[in-house]
């Protein structure tokens, strides 16, 4: 029987500091939480200048519909998608941060729900995906104005999702075989995105520990290892 209740050995950043810790790091973690929550709060409200403030200039992000892109390309794609009718919102549920003792690197995990409105065969539905953002933060002076926190990389764990009718009793016909061909953690979201947005969604996005033995399960473990490497001061490619 697979072990679905434990993280892979060696993935916990033992030297990082999290809850409690020195007061100066509590303040730093508060700054990082505000930055992490800025993704859903700023993006959903089209506050693009504020959204840009989350990132360092060379930051890279991953999402289901965009793939791996620079954050400015992600912003451009988000704007184009909105103009074409894409309606994506988020709900934030909680955040944790692991930070180095010298307050130069951190990883913030933000629990959230992605909720996207779709119209399929003239019927409105919401795909809702429970996920965790994973922000790789670094404090650096990138513009000559002094050190500041910014994201270098942003990824997600896509853990489970569902498809809901907007109007009770009205639900479009779903190709269940096609739906079940997608990764378990975000199959409803990707089904609707590919059907309506003209995109090809990546099939190996990180999932939940329960997805062990699948590509999403492998990427789940890899993302934890990358987070540890980041906090250990290593150079990584996400």
From Swiss-Prot:
- The portions of this protein that span the membrane are none
**What InterPro entries does UniProt report for this protein, alphabetically?**
NTF2-like_dom_sf, SnoaL-like
**SUPFAM superfamilies per the record?**
NTF2-like
The segments labelled Disordered in the record are: 1-20
- Superkingdom of this entry's organism? Eukaryota
Task: Give the similarity note.
Answer: Belongs to the PEP2 family.
Name this polypeptide is given: Uncharacterized protein AN9274
